[in-house]
Amino acid sequence: MAHTKAGGTTRNSRDSAGRRLGVKATDGQFVNAGSIIYRQRGTKIFPGNNVGRGKDDTLFALISGIVKFEDRINRKFASVYAVEDLKAKK
């Protein structure tokens, strides 16, 4: 009976690929309607003006314009403003 028993398998030997989360459009960048602004799990950043939220909490632009990340009371928001609106504010 001089033989080795079968070795057990390891349970933790695999690693999943990264999910490519994070900022996809930076502050001040022009985006087209439907463009993804931020990929996230949960609402780390909330949708602001002209920004929608997908079922996986992805933020996307509802109109074409300039992205602005804003801090409001204890929350961060991503908004998209039309170029004409930004010119009118100046």
From Swiss-Prot:
Entry's Gene Ontology molecular function annotations: structural constituent of ribosome
Location of the region described as Disordered in the Swiss-Prot/TrEMBL record: 1-21
InterPro entries per UniProt: Ribosomal_bL27, Ribosomal_bL27_CS
Alphabetical keyword list: Ribonucleoprotein, Ribosomal protein
GO CC annotations, alphabetized: cytosolic large ribosomal subunit
Cysteines joined through disulfide linkages: none
Any one biological process term the GO annotation gives: translation
Top-rank lineage group of the source organism: Bacteria
Family, as annotated: Belongs to the bacterial ribosomal protein bL27 family.
PANTHER family, per the entry: LARGE RIBOSOMAL SUBUNIT PROTEIN BL27M (PTHR15893:SF0), RIBOSOMAL PROTEIN L27 (PTHR15893)
Annotated protein name in UniProt: Large ribosomal subunit protein bL27
Gene this chain is encoded by: rpmA
